[in-house]
Amino acid sequence: MLKFTLHKKDGLARRGTLELNHGKIETPVFMPVGTYGSVKAMNPQNLHDIKAQIILGNTYHLWLRPGLEVVEQFGGLHGFIGWDKPILTDSGGFQVFSLSDMRKLTEEGCTFKSPINGDKLFLSPEISMKIQTVLNSDIAMQLDECTPGETTREQARKSLQMSLRWAERSKKAFEDLKNPNALFGIVQGAMYEDLREESLRGLEEFDFPGLAVGGLSVGEPKPEMYRMLHAVGPILPEHKPHYLMGVGTPEDLVYGVAHGIDMFDCVMPTRNARNGWLFTRFGDLKIKNAKHKLDKRPIDESCTCYACQNFSRAYLHHLHRAGEILGAQLNTIHNLHFYQVIMAEMREAVEQGKFADWQAQFHENRARGVD
C-alpha cells in the first residue's frame, strides 16, 4: 500500500504525506540507514526519540547475513529488528555492482562471489523482489544497473535500457509474489540530462507508485550532481513521491528539497558521527580536536538532542579519544537529530510559503562556522 498526498508547494519544494503499511510519513523526510537491520550505534528507542519516521535496510547484506530463512521466521524485518515504523529496502544492486572484480553481468542478472564465504551467488530482478518480499519492507526498489558518474554516453544509454527491462521484470515479479507493499522505479542515465529524461519516460509505462533518482553521489563532482538534480527534479511526476538515493550532506538535503525531492537516505550522519565529525546549525565540528579538551559547552547550545542537553564537548572529546562506544552513540544521536530537525524545519517552511527565506538563513548560519 502507498498513498501520497501533496499538501503544499513552494517553488519546487514540496510538503506531503506518505501512507504506508506500517504508518504515515511526513515529507520531506530523511531515512537513517540500517544496513544490517540496525542503524549503527542506535537502538530503536533512540530512533523514536530523534523522531525518525522510516529507516532503510540493505537487501544485499541482509540476504547474505543473517539470511532469508532467519528473517522469515519473524514475519519480516520489522519483527526481527523490533521496529514498528516503515522500512525501505534497496534492491541490492548497488552493493553487487560495487564488486566489480568479483561479478559477471548479463541480461538475466549478476553472478558474484559472496565476500563472506566465497559462495557463488546470483541476483536478478526476480530474486531481488523475492528477498524484499520476505523482508516485508514498506517500500522496495527495483533492481537496476548502477553506473558510475564517468560512464560514457553509449555505456549510460545501454545501461539505462537494461535497467528499464529490469524495471518491467521487477514489477511483474513483485506482483506475481502478491507483495502488499510499494515498489519504486529508479531513474538512471549517469550525467546526461537527455538520458535521464529517456529513463524517466521509459519508467512511465510501468506506473510505479514512487520514483527514485539513482546514480548520483557515486564519485561525481558536487556541481555535476546538482546539475542533474536541477534537470531531473522539475520533470518528475508531481503526484508521486521523489526519492534521491544515497545523498547526502545537510546542504545536499536542502538543495534536493529545493528541486522537488521528498525522500533522502545517506550513511553520512552516522559514519561521520563515529569518526567524531558533528553537524551543527553553524557548521561542522570535529570533536576529536584538542581545542575541545576543556570545553564545557554542548555540541550546539541551540540543539535539544540528548547529547547536547546532558554532556559537554570535553566529555565527548574524551569518549572519542578513548574509543568508548558511548561516544559513538552520543555523536550519532546528535547528528541524526540534527538531520531530523532540518527536515522538520523545511516541512514547516514549505507550509508557510517561506522556503526561500529559510534556505537563505540556513546557508548563512552554516557558513558562519562553529565557535
From Swiss-Prot:
Report the cofactor remark: Binds 1 zinc ion per subunit.
Report residues binding Zn(2+).
303, 305, 308, 334
EC supergroup of this enzyme: transferase
Required cofactor(s): Zn(2+)
Catalytic residues, per the record, are 90 (proton acceptor), 265 (nucleophile)
Disulfide connectivity for this sequence is: none
User: Does Kinase appear among the keywords?
Assistant: no
A Gene Ontology annotation in the biological process aspect, one of them, is: tRNA-guanine transglycosylation
- Per the record, the domain of life is Bacteria
Q: Where is this region: RNA binding?
A: 246-252, 270-274
Classification via SUPFAM superfamilies: tRNA-guanine transglycosylase
Q: Part of which pathway?
A: tRNA modification; tRNA-queuosine biosynthesis
Point out the signal peptide segment: none
Question: Might you give the EC number(s) for this enzyme?
Answer: 2.4.2.29
InterPro entries referenced in this protein's UniProt entry, alphabetically = ArchSynthase1/Queuine_TRR, TGT, TGT-like_sf, tRNA_ribo_trans-like
Molecular function GO terms recorded: metal ion binding; tRNA-guanosine(34) queuine transglycosylase activity
Coiled-coil spans are none
Q: Which keywords label this protein?
A: Glycosyltransferase, Metal-binding, Queuosine biosynthesis, Transferase, tRNA processing, Zinc
Q: Name one GO cellular component term.
A: cytosol
Q: Which NCBIfam families match?
A: Q_tRNA_tgt, tgt_general
By its UniProt entry, which HAMAP family does this protein fall under? Q_tRNA_Tgt
Q: How does it assemble?
A: Homodimer. Within each dimer, one monomer is responsible for RNA recognition and catalysis, while the other monomer binds to the replacement base PreQ1.
What does the UniProt function comment say about this protein?
Catalyzes the base-exchange of a guanine (G) residue with the queuine precursor 7-aminomethyl-7-deazaguanine (PreQ1) at position 34 (anticodon wobble position) in tRNAs with GU(N) anticodons (tRNA-Asp, -Asn, -His and -Tyr). Catalysis occurs through a double-displacement mechanism. The nucleophile active site attacks the C1' of nucleotide 34 to detach the guanine base from the RNA, forming a covalent enzyme-RNA intermediate. The proton acceptor active site deprotonates the incoming PreQ1, allowing a nucleophilic attack on the C1' of the ribose to form the product.
What family does the entry list? Belongs to the queuine tRNA-ribosyltransferase family.
Protein name as catalogued = Queuine tRNA-ribosyltransferase
Source species of the chain: Neisseria gonorrhoeae (strain NCCP11945)
The gene designation is tgt
